[in-house]
Regions:
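Extended recognition/assembly regions associated with phosphoester-bond processing machinery
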Residues: 1-28, 32-178
Length: 178
């Protein structure tokens, strides 16, 4: 079916319940929603309503931060957030429920502990021309070329197979970005 999250949905929900019950904060580091392969947010929320329900619990408890990545860069637009992230339709109550009303979705986040030590969080696509500046082109290629190939069984040619030189260059650029 092309849904890479479906097989892990129950594992995600169980982990999120544990983290919520034990006082953790949830930080989504981008690409939480595959918006290159999928044109709309609504079917994602409908399919994974349990995941969005528990994420909304974190949000209501002020224990959630969301960053956007290259695959969900449209979340950087306030108009997208207002239209797709404020509420969702819940079948069990046959009506709309709050999702993340008023959420701000950022490109990066700095955490600071009581000793003033800082940790810089970012999705990681920054510094890569295709995934950062040319993401609309990359989205087109994924949506209309890669996804159909994936549906017939081709494996992703990205990720860990990158040459070390390229990884080192991107790491230097991200350090400069920080």
């Amino acid at each position: 079916n092309g849904d890479n999250f479906l097989n892990n949905q129950n594992l995600f929900f169980g982990a999120m319940e544990y983290y919520y019950d034990n006082g953790f904060t949830y930080i989504e580091l981008g690409d939480g929603d595959e918006l290159w392969e999928n044109r709309k947010m609504c079917p994602i929320i409908e399919t994974h309503s349990d995941a969005f329900w528990i994420m909304s619990k974190f949000y209501r408890a002020n224990r959630m931060y969301m960053l956007y990545g290259n695959h969900d860069a449209v979340k950087s637009r306030p108009s997208f957030i207002k239209k797709h992230c404020n509420h969702y339709y819940c079948d069990s109550v046959r009506g709309c429920l709050p999702l993340f009303p008023g959420i701000q979705i950022h490109q990066s986040l700095i955490l600071e502990d009581s000793e003033k030590r800082r940790l810089f969080l970012v999705h990681g696509h920054q510094g890569n021309l295709l995934n950062d500046q040319l993401w609309p082109l990359a989205r087109f290629l994924v949506r209309y070329v890669w996804r159909p190939l994936e549906l017939v069984g081709f494996l992703a040619p990205t990720g860990a197979g990158r040459p070390n030189k390229k990884k080192d260059r991107i790491e230097r650029e991200l350090a400069a970005f920080a």
